[in-house]
């Protein structure tokens, strides 16, 4: 039995929580899907599903496998589409891996600036965390990485690098919302905080800055998404220090944004793989992203190439203090 079909069956059962529903979606019999799941579990030596009520849910091992299977199947689909494009001489899409802040805050306007109508570039965008963005570029899965620091790697070319200070997001009925800022860090002491949960990068620098200032906060919610953090802040879970890019894309009612008296830099840019040619349209998109960042962020600073390494090294050192 095709291993690809087995993985497709696993993913459908994981998504739908039912062998019957997965079989209907795949157009095969229920016993066939059951056999495929049993074969996969036998080969791996681990149960991948357990029953909770009427649904099948992934075991911890099954959850770990899911991301890899989704990525592998998406890669197969992309490969098939690229093969058809080569045969049909269609211009392939620019493959981009981006963190959510840049995908949401820069890419749409950069795409519009890079061309209109028939001249607009075709894009294939995957939204990932910073480490996976870098891996996608180095492995060749993506031609462009739109990501945040850390960015230093010998196999990457840093096309441009910029910084902008993080901001404080509070509910519009919060006492701090009545101020104009900048807000001192000590004003956050004892408050409930909606925090970002990534181990490195700006979440680590936020934690290090609060720790260095002796500011004790109660983290009520941690999330990897700025949009998700803002939703919790609006719902009353607390206040939050967030990167500034997401907020430039769309105004969020119920949220007040304030500057901080202590600068916590959000460092971001575009990377490509060293030694790999970059198509002209991809280069135009990279340049357009920089222009959009400069236009959207009043406090944006473009870092000269000769200062890239020292800045990124200093940010990494700051994170290490935590």
Annotate the PLM regions.
Residues 11-29:
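Short helix-boundary/capping micro-motifs
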Residues 29-32, 36-39, 110:
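Residues within the DNA-recognition helix of helix-turn-helix
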Residues 41-60:
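A short LG(V/I)-centered, amphipathic sequence patch enriched
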Residues 43-44, 65-87:
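Alpha-helical linker/hinge and terminal dimerization helices associated
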Residues 91-154, 223:
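Central regulatory/effector-binding core of bacterial HTH transcription factors
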Residues 154-160, 164, 227-275:
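Beta-alpha-beta core module
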Residues 156-193:
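Flexible hinge/capping segments at coil-to-helix
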Residues 178, 192-213, 278-287, 292-305:
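Secondary-structure junction motif
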């Amino acid at each position: 039995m095709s291993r690809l079909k087995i993985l497709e069956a696993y993913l459908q059962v994981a998504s739908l929580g039912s062998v019957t529903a997965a079989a209907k979606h795949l157009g095969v019999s229920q016993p066939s899907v059951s056999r495929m799941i049993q074969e996969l579990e036998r080969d791996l030596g681990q149960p991948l599903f357990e029953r909770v009520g009427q649904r099948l849910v992934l075991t911890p091992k099954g959850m770990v496998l899911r991301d890899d299977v989704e990525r592998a199947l998406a890669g197969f689909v992309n490969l098939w589409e690229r093969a058809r494009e080569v045969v049909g001489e269609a211009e392939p899409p620019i493959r981009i891996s981006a963190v959510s802040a840049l995908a949401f805050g820069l890419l749409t306007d950069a795409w519009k600036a890079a061309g209109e109508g028939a001249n607009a570039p075709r894009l294939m965008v995957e939204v990932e965390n910073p480490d996976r963005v870098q891996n996608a570029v180095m492995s060749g899965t993506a031609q462009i990485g739109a990501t945040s620091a850390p960015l230093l790697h010998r196999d990457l070319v840093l096309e441009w690098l910029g910084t902008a200070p993080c901001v404080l997001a509070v509910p519009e009925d919060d006492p701090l919302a009545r101020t104009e800022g900048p807000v001192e860090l000590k004003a956050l002491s004892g408050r409930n905080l909606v925090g970002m949960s990534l181990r490195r990068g700006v979440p680590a620098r936020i934690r290090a800055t609060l720790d260095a200032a002796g500011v004790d906060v109660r983290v009520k919610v941690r999330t990897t998404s700025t949009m998700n953090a803002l939703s919790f802040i609006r719902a009353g879970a607390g206040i939050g220090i967030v990167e500034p890019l997401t907020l430039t894309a769309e105004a969020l009612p119920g949220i007040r944004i304030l500057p901080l008296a202590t600068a916590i830099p959000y460092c971001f840019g575009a990377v490509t793989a060293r030694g790999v040619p970059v198509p002209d349209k991809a280069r135009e998109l990279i340049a357009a992203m920089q222009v959009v960042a400069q236009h959207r962020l009043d406090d944006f600073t473009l870092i000269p190439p000769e200062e890239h390494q020292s800045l990124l090294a200093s940010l990494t050192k700051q994170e290490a203090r935590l």
